[in-house]
A protein has these predicted regions:
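Transmembrane helical cores of multi-pass secondary ion antiporters/exchangers
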Residues: 1-324
Length: 324
């Protein structure tokens, strides 16, 4: 019963933040983080610790699939070069640059570990996209940022896994590159296969409700086999969504597409809101753990984080400005 009450309150909080955010000029994800932080410091609220596996396996595949399946086909094809550059090339370049920076700032850290940390902080998230939409930039910029957000998390996680593998074993640079390429290529193949199978099956189902139920399973049908084969489940989910979105107008009825769009918008709202609310709720537990550390170590950590933030902004500016 207690878990049910928490879930209901969380849903109400997500709905309220989404409705109030635009009125107060604050992006809904950022507002949810603030609410989560405030709640985490209430004396009767226990420490919240979320298993990362729940996010990686249960939340991110449908969240990224939802965003990719709703991506406008024409705009995505037109801006594919910019989107792929930002979501793949820029993430890799930023992660490697931060890897060298961390090896210089933190004594004893290896380059592979530095790149792993760089992969964690390089991608943009929903807050950035929400802020950009609100300040009224051109539709092209919004399309590019939304497209970038589809793949940059997946790219960063593949790079993170490869970097962690490099820290745990004696592997060569080309072995790491091979692992990265394998994870992406196999995931793309599975995503394409699942996407076309999804369109084929659902074009033969007449009931809109059954059609929607099938669609909810698609990101997991793409992600789970990919992970079992050592590839990226997130890349597979994104590709399956892109294939579905590109072919839906030709293969699915208007009723099915409308039902799909409404249900996936709801799922995306709930999952994205839960992620940011959870970030805020975890802060109290994180600070409690940090209190056991030396204050000097915490201060050094803040300085390193500030330098890393500046470095990410500089690298992104150097990459983006010539393309404007």
């Amino acid at each position: 019963m207690e878990l049910l009450v928490v879930a209901v309150l969380g849903l109400l909080g997500i709905a309220a933040a989404t409705a109030i955010g635009p009125k107060v000029g604050v992006a809904a994800p950022l507002l949810l983080v603030i609410v989560g932080i405030a709640v985490s410091f209430l004396p009767f609220v226990p420490d919240v610790v979320i298993d990362p596996e729940w996010i990686l396996a249960g939340v991110l595949p449908p969240l990224l699939y939802s965003a990719s399946v709703s991506m406008p086909s024409m705009e995505f094809r037109r801006e594919f070069g910019a989107i792929s550059g930002l979501s793949v090339v820029l993430v890799v370049v930023s992660s490697v640059a931060l890897g060298f920076l961390f090896t210089w700032l933190v004594p004893g850290i290896s380059l592979a570990a530095g790149i792993a940390f760089g992969a964690i902080v390089s991608p943009t998230d929903a807050v950035a996209t929400s802020i950009v939409k609100r300040i009224g930039v051109t539709p092209r910029v919004v399309t590019v940022l939304e497209g970038e957000s589809l793949l940059n998390d997946a790219t960063a996680l593949v790079l993170l896994r490869s970097a962690i593998a490099a820290t745990a074993a004696s592997v060569t640079f080309w072995q790491v590159v091979g692992d990265f390429v394998f994870a992406v290529v196999v995931a793309v193949m599975i995503g394409v296969l699942v996407g076309f199978a999804n369109l084929w099956l659902r074009s033969r189902v007449t009931d809109a409700t059954v059609n929607t139920v099938i669609s909810v399973t698609v990101p997991f049908l793409a992600a789970v086999p990919s992970e079992l084969l050592g590839a990226s489940g997130l890349v597979a989910a994104v590709v399956a969504g892109l294939v579905t979105g590109q072919g839906a107008a030709r293969r699915l009825s208007p009723q099915h597409r409308q039902s799909d769009a409404q249900n996936w918008r709801t799922i995306e709202l709930i999952l994205e809101g839960a992620v940011f609310l959870g970030r805020g709720l975890e802060l109290s537990a994180i600070l409690s753990a940090l209190q056991a550390e030396e204050s000097r170590g915490i201060a050094v950590g803040w300085r390193i984080a500030a330098v890393a933030l500046v470095a990410v902004i500089v690298v992104r500016a150097i990459y983006v400005l010539p393309t404007l």
